[in-house]
Structure formats: C-alpha cells, structure tokens
Amino acid sequence: DVQLQESGPGLVKPSQSLSLTCTVTGYSITSDYAWNWIRQFPGNKLEWVGYITYSGSTNYNPSLKSRISITRDTSKNQFFLQFNSVTSEDTATYFCARSWFAYWGQGTLVTVSSAKTTPPSVYPLAP
C-alpha cells in the first residue's frame, strides 16, 4: 500500500526558512506520477503549492514560485519543500500527495510565529 508521511519543524519564526519532508513508502517516486505539496489554511481553504515529477522536473504555484523549491532524495524515497521568507500567512497544515491525489499524507501543522514555544496539542486532565 502507498503511504506518505510529512515531517517538519512545527514552529517557524517570521522571515526564516521552512523545510518539510515527505517520506513515501510502498511506491518509488522515480517510477511515475507527480509528487505534490498542498497546504490547508485555517478555515479549510486548500492551496496547491507545487510538485516534482518522477523524472525530477518541477512545477510551482505562480504566486509562490519566488519563495519555494521542491527537491528530492531518490535514495531515501523522499521529497522536500523549502519555503523561504515565511510570514504568518504561511501558517497552515502542509500535505504531500501523489497525483491524481489518490494518496495523501496526514499533514503537518506549521505555525509561523515569533513565540518561543508551541502550545501543547494535548492537555492533561486533572486527577
């Protein structure tokens, strides 16, 4: 079965760079298809970011083209998104997916903030 898994830093400071990894299992990224990055903003709006094809060619959302790069490591069956000069408007859940979007990762939340730490996602209950 084809599986995709995103990983990333969770919290990034404004103006810094964001690097995300998508690890693919069950299918070689050099065999076929385009391997996409998509993001979902708070409020659920989706935006296609870009892709890298099985042959290594890339295509980017024109509105993001100046700030992003998608690369890959075929030996690890991974592909990557580098996002430069991030702002709070880049806060989103980032997904990787195989065309034609039949297989998606679970997504990784990226928050762009000058805060030093992220709040816990699970709060313990008092005994």
Language-model segments: what does each one mean?
Residues D1-P127:
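Extracellular domains of the immunoglobulin superfamily
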